[in-house]
Amino acid sequence: RDWYIWSDTDPGNGWHQGAQGYYYGFFWSGMPDLNYTNPEVTAQMNNVVRYWLDDIGVDGFRIDAAKHLIEDGDQRENTPATHDWYKKFYAVYKTDHPNAYTVGEVYGAGGFIAQTYTDQLDHVFNFELASGFVNSANGRSNTGINSAYTLTLKNMLEGNFATFLTNHDQNRTMSVFNGD
C-alpha cells in the first residue's frame, strides 16, 4: 500500500476510488502514481535502472512526464522534492554508467524550464522550439521559432537542445504539416 499515494477522503482531481480509500493517479485511474517519497520505491527504481543498464545494456532512458514525479499539496509539477529525487537518481546511474543518457519529457519546457534540470537529466525536450519548427514549416509566422531559438541559445547549455517535432502525446508530424 505504501508504494502508492493514498487518502481516506477524496481530495479532488486526480484521486480515484479504490478498495482501501482513494489513490492518486494524475493521468488516469488505470495508472496510479508511485509514492517516490517511500525509500522502498526509490530503491526498487534504482534496481530497475541498474538492471536495464547492466544486464540488458541499454544506453539510457526517456522519462515521460518527468515533472510529475512528486506532488506537494496542490503543486503537481516541478516540485522541489521532484528535483531532489532526480538529483539523487542521476548520481546513482551516472556513477557506474557515466555515458548513460537520459532525456526528460517536461511538457511546456523551453530554455528557462530546462535549466532547472541540468544537474538531474542530460536533456529535456524543448517544446517551445518544437512548436516553432512546426508552425514555421506550416507557413505560419516565423517569430515563434525565432524567439524560441533565441531563448534556447540564451538559456541552454551549449548543444543541449533536445529537439523534436511532435511526440506520442501530440498529433504526429504527417497530420500537422500542411501539404508536403
Residue spans for each PLM region:
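Active-site and adjacent substrate-binding regions of carbohydrate-active enzymes
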Residues: R1-D180
